[in-house]
Every structure is written in structure tokens, then in C-alpha cells.
Curated annotation (Swiss-Prot):
Catalytic reaction annotation: di-trans,octa-cis-undecaprenyl diphospho-N-acetyl-alpha-D-muramoyl-L-alanyl-D-glutamyl-meso-2,6-diaminopimeloyl-D-alanyl-D-alanine + UDP-N-acetyl-alpha-D-glucosamine = di-trans,octa-cis-undecaprenyl diphospho-[N-acetyl-alpha-D-glucosaminyl-(1->4)]-N-acetyl-alpha-D-muramoyl-L-alanyl-D-glutamyl-meso-2,6-diaminopimeloyl-D-alanyl-D-alanine + UDP + H(+)
Keyword Cell division: yes
Organism the protein comes from: Neisseria meningitidis serogroup B (strain ATCC BAA-335 / MC58)
Broad EC category: transferase
Name of protein: UDP-N-acetylglucosamine--N-acetylmuramyl-(pentapeptide) pyrophosphoryl-undecaprenol N-acetylglucosamine transferase
UniProt-listed Pfam families: Glyco_tran_28_C, Glyco_transf_28
Subcellular location: Cell inner membrane
Binding site for UDP-N-acetyl-alpha-D-glucosamine: T13, G14, G15, N125, R162, S190, I244, Q289
Gene name per UniProt: murG
InterPro entries: GlcNAc_MurG, Glyco_trans_28_C, GlycoTrans_28_N
Keywords on record: Cell cycle, Cell division, Cell inner membrane, Cell membrane, Cell shape, Cell wall biogenesis/degradation, Glycosyltransferase, Membrane, Peptidoglycan synthesis, Transferase
GO biological process, any: lipid glycosylation
NCBIfam families per UniProt: murG (TIGR01133)
Length: 355
């Protein structure tokens, strides 16, 4: 049986999981084998098997901000999970581990270190997570999506995104021939963002009818009815859906996006070439979403709107001052930030480390 065996370590959020899946695809396309190390009762436990990848799990959860009992048990938990990760690495004869972040990454990486298996890490956010910060001391390659996340030279590779998003036509081609109202996409993640669901309809109601953009608004799970009711009560027309299954078409048709600033969102915006009004999730670990947002804003590819400053009046003022020319400029600037070969770059770095 040809090919090398790689163990991907990622979990907890889509921002860790989906970039890792893109790298898994790249490795498998090159004839290599992939297994996945995740946590029990987790998002990755629901998602990863759908892609035909063997999933192994550890019984571990995060410790930051959690109760004193869990912190006191950490040495025992770490010992047990490292031993289990070592067993998994030996069982599958893993030749290189790739850490993307999440609770499971540290014990998996420590197990690899103790067994002499090469470690590669990929950091998706502008502020490196705790697991990756620790593993960077032992890693053979340190890769990252945002400048300054780490100081290691030659590690800037961007965030892996789906090829169909990277392959969208350039902004100038997409925007050509567009007339009439701006088309704005609102996404708060798969669970939605209550603050966007509440504020966006109110902001549109403050604008004259002929100045209102055309809205395509993802409510998030279980929130469609209340969102549509709010739009209807305010007399504002909008197309609302619970979850957008075809994000490629949504990005293709939008002039602008109103969204959070997770690493995966920023990667998709730059890959597609779309400007954004970015409202970072204020409770993200190390406030990394604000740092992610600044990456786009500094390139004049959008605006940063801290949640504490987000009001219907402020948003209405911003929307009222937009035009398609400005949106196109933001979109073009966003596209210049894209690193569309990220998944292949991470895969090739790991293959070289496993050699």
C-alpha cells in the first residue's frame, strides 16, 4: 500500500475543521492516507466521517475559563490523553501529524513529540491559539494564515478554502453590468448572530425605501421565523433563509457582506474577493476576531464595526453612504489578500517533513 500516513488534529469549531478538511483532500489527491484526531462529543465527530476519513477521538475539553475542578484534573487528563494519542499514532503508523488547533491538538502533538514523529502546525487566526503556541516549540514547520501570527520565516500560506470559492471570477467581471440596489449578504455563522439578526432589519427600516439594499440574510439554526417576522413588522423586504447551502452562489451574487470575522470567513472573503462590514464576535478567545478583521480593514477591503458600537442608526448611516463603486474597490482589495493555494502548500510542507 503506497503513500504516507498523516494524522490531522483539529476540532471544536468550523474554523479549525474546514481548513483541515481541505488539506486532507489535497493529501489524499496525492495518494496519501489521512486519519483524524478529534474530541469526543464534538463538531468534528459529526462532520469528519461524512468525508470518508477515519476519526479517532480523545476525551478532552478546553480548560480556559472553565471550573476549578477541571483545571485540577488537567494533569491526569493530559497524561491519559497523551497515552491514548500515542497508541493511535502507533496503531496507524503515522509518519507526520498536522495540528490545526482546538483542545485535541496539544495532547496529540505532545504524543508525536515523545514518539519522534514530525509535527507541522497551521494557525488560522491572526492571534495564535494556545495549543499551537505550545506546539510551535517542537514543530518541524510552523505555517500560518496571517502575517505576524508567528515570527517563523517562510510560514505564511493563508487559510485553506474550497477551490470553488477561489475559482470565482474576479470582482470586476462579477460586478460588470450590475445595476440598481446593492445586494448584501448577511451571515453570522451556522448558528447565526443575534446582534446582526436584530440590528440589520432595524437599520434598513431607517433608510428610505429606494435607498434600501437587497438583502439575503442567513438567520442561523432555529431563528428564521423570528428574523422574517422582524423584517415584516418593519415593512422591509428581505430574503431570509435558515442556512445557505450554496455559499459559492451567495458570494458570487453579493456586492458586500455583513458578517463576523472568524478565520474561515476572512479566508473565504479574500478568496472570493468581497468587501465586508465586519462585526467581530466580542467573546472570542484572545479577541482574535478583531485582529482578523483588521487584516482586511488595513487593506481597505471593508470596515470594522465593534459590536459595542453597532446600532441601527450607525449601520443605517454606513449603508446609506455605500455605492457599488466603493463595494467593487473593497472587493478588488480583498482579492489581493488571497492565497489560493494554501491547502496544497500545507500538504506539501507536511509531505516534505514526513520524508
Amino acid at each position: 500500500m503506497g503513500g504516507k500516513t498523516f494524522m490531522l488534529m483539529a476540532g471544536g469549531t468550523g474554523g479549525h475543521i474546514f481548513p483541515a478538511l481541505a488539506v486532507a483532500d489535497s493529501l489524499r489527491a496525492r495518494g496519501h492516507h489521512v486519519i483524524w484526531l478529534g474530541s469526543k462529543d464534538s463538531m468534528e465527530e459529526r462532520i469528519v466521517p461524512q468525508y470518508g476519513i477515519r476519526l479517532e477521538t480523545l476525551a478532552i475539553k478546553g480548560v480556559r475559563g472553565n471550573g476549578i475542578k477541571r483545571k485540577l484534573m488537567l494533569p491526569v487528563t493530559l497524561y491519559q490523553t497523551v497515552r491514548e494519542a500515542q497508541r493511535i499514532i502507533r496503531k496507524h503508523r503515522v509518519e507526520c501529524v498536522i495540528g490545526f488547533g482546538g483542545f485535541v491538538t496539544f495532547p496529540g502533538g505532545l504524543a508525536a513529540k515523545l514518539l519522534g514523529v514530525p509535527i507541522v502546525i497551521h494557525e488560522q487566526n491572526a492571534v495564535a491559539g494556545l495549543s499551537n503556541r505550545h506546539l510551535s516549540r517542537w514543530a518541524k514547520r510552523v505555517l500560518y494564515a496571517f502575517p505576524k501570527a508567528f515570527s517563523h520565516e517562510g510560514g505564511l500560506v493563508g487559510n485553506p478554502v474550497r477551490a470553488d470559492i477561489s475559482n470565482l471570477p474576479v470582482p470586476a467581471e462579477r460586478f460588470q453590468g450590475r445595476e440598481g440596489r446593492l445586494k448584501i449578504l448577511v451571515v453570522g455563522g451556522s448558528l447565526g448572530a443575534d446582534v446582526l439578526n436584530k440590528t440589520v432589519p432595524q437599520a434598513l427600516a431607517l433608510l428610505p425605501d429606494n435607498a434600501r439594499p437587497q438583502m439575503y440574510h442567513q438567520s442561523g439554526r432555529g431563528k428564521l421565523g423570528s428574523l422574517q417576522a422582524d423584517y415584516d413588522a418593519l415593512g422591509v423586504k428581505a430574503e431570509c433563509v435558515e442556512f445557505i447551502t450554496d455559499m459559492v452562489s451567495a458570494y458570487r451574487d453579493a456586492d458586500l457582506v455583513i458578517c463576523r470575522a472568524g478565520a474561515l470567513t476572512i479566508a473565504e472573503l479574500t478568496a472570493a474577493g468581497l468587501g465586508a462590514l465586519l462585526v467581530p464576535y466580542p467573546h472570542a478567545v484572545d479577541d482574535h476576531q478583531t485582529a482578523n478583521a483588521r487584516f482586511m480593514v488595513q487593506a481597505e477591503a471593508g470596515l470594522l464595526l465593534p459590536q459595542t458600537q453597532l446600532t441601527a442608526e450607525k449601520l443605517a448611516e454606513i449603508l446609506g453612504g455605500l455605492n457599488r463603486e466603493k463595494c467593487l474597490k473593497w472587493a478588488e482589495n480583498a482579492r489581493t489578500l488571497a492565497l489560493p493555494h494554501s491547502a496544497d502548500d500545507v500538504a506539501e510542507a507536511a509531505i516534505a517533513c514526513a520524508a
